[in-house]
């Protein structure tokens, strides 16, 4: 009996040790992503010709599939300049970029050999549009992400054609051909471009078993050991991907990313002028940073490959702000609870520098509460101006920290969002109790 107990204990120790090693390996693999904070999403495809919803327009019967595909004839990419795109993206402060290699319409933007439906073979663009972009991103030290739709409403072996029409309901031979097709395209992308990240979409229509999600994830990591996968592969991904709506509380997954459009459309739509302001975009980025996540901000180029002027303006102002405040963005971790400061915050990795984001012109001193640490220094991020502070309500007999009042001169304010850095005497130590009554004087 004693031998059995020892054997079980030793097996548990080995298992725990193995699990810890896997956890450390995952942490190391995900570090660049957790540090990045900002990525740029690109939805580019034939839907930009008419300026209609990508893929969904024919799936929802707003336009026939035949008329949707006629857009291939107008997709020229005649002014596409991958170097300019990459330079603009790097200049925005983004550390990675994700481009649609194929949306739900099945039209590939690279020279796939797995079928004939690509802009290379079927449109005036007539060339691989992914290859030059990947090269230019790497020249600019920007990580490469590839978007890939698992479902394909144009493929003859995919079950669903539109919301109302199915090609078939149960045909294992056709389904297996389609799964093989997905594996074929993803092997091409993996071996040709060696992406740092895959951004899957469309997994909701089938189960993990039908997609062969486990085998697919293993294959992708076999072709490219360190590739990161998003969550949309039926539970086999590395990070969560809330969409459009800003999370009010932090997602459960340690690693997460909000994907969001600049206006109301993923792809280029000439009638959509409802753009967010640079200030709104910056504040959403800050909210993501505050909760320990990333922002993947979308742009939608035109059919000729030019990026709309409104989108360029937003990216450039975003770049000005991120460049100025880099220390309070990249490599930071989630901030302190709102009870301590009425605004978003972040911490450096060591946890001894607290960043306060100031989105408005203060009408008095900033207020910081419940910090048990000694404050060594305060400064304005981006210009280095040292700040004065005052502590009130600190009693010698009480463990409750005093309230810190911080004076921020108007001359140091950024036109979008100001950031204050506070150097503490060690890792941030928060008072989270309910106050104290005097017992002795």
What are these regions (language model features)?
Residues 20-441:
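Mature catalytic domains of secreted/periplasmic carbohydrate-active enzymes
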Residues 1-22:
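Bacterial Sec-dependent N-terminal signal peptides
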């Amino acid at each position: 009996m004693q031998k059995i107990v020892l054997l079980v204990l030793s097996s548990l120790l080995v298992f725990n040790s193995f699990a810890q090693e896997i956890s450390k390996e995952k942490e190391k693999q995900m570090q660049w992503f957790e540090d990045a904070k900002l990525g740029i999403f690109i939805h580019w495809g034939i839907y930009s010709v008419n300026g209609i919803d990508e893929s969904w327009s024919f799936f929802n019967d707003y336009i026939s599939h035949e008329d949707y595909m006629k857009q291939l004839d107008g997709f020229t990419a005649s002014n596409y300049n991958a170097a300019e795109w990459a330079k603009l993206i790097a200049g925005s402060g983004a550390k990675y970029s994700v481009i649609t290699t194929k949306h739900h319409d099945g039209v590939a933007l690279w020279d796939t050999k797995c079928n004939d439906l690509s802009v290379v073979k079927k449109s005036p663009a007539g060339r691989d549009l992914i290859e030059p972009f990947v090269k230019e991103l790497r020249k600019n030290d920007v990580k490469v992400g590839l978007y890939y739709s698992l479902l394909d409403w144009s493929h003859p072996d995919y079950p669903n054609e539109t919301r109302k029409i199915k090609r078939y309901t149960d045909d294992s031979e056709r389904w297996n051909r389609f799964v093989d097709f997905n594996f074929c395209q993803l092997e091409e992308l993996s071996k040709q471009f060696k992406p740092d990240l895959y951004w899957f979409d469309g997994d909701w229509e089938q189960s993990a078993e039908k997609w062969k999600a486990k085998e697919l994830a293993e294959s992708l990591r076999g072709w490219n050991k360190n590739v990161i996968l998003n969550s949309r592969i039926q539970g086999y991904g590395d990070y969560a991907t809330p969409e459009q709506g800003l999370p009010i509380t932090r997602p459960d997954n340690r690693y997460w990313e909000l994907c969001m459009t600049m206006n109301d459309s993923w792809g280029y739509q000439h009638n959509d002028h409802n753009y967010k302001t640079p200030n709104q975009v910056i504040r959403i980025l800050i909210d993501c940073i505050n909760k320990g996540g990333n922002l993947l901000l979308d742009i939608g180029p035109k059919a000729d490959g030019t990026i709309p002027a409104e989108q360029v303006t937003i990216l450039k102002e975003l770049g000005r702000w991120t460049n100025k405040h880099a220390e309070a963005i990249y490599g930071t971790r989630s901030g302190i609870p709102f009870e301590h400061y009425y605004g978003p915050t972040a911490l450096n990795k060591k946890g001894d520098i607290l960043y306060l984001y100031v989105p408005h012109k203060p009408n008095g001193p900033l207020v910081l509460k419940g910090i048990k640490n000694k404050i060594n220094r305060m400064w304005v991020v981006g210009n280095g101006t040292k700040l004065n502070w005052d502590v009130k309500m600190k009693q010698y007999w009480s463990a409750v920290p005093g309230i810190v009042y911080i004076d921020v001169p108007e001359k140091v304010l950024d036109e979008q969002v100001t950031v204050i850095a506070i150097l503490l005497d060690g890792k941030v130590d928060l008072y989270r109790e309910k106050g104290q009554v005097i017992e002795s004087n």
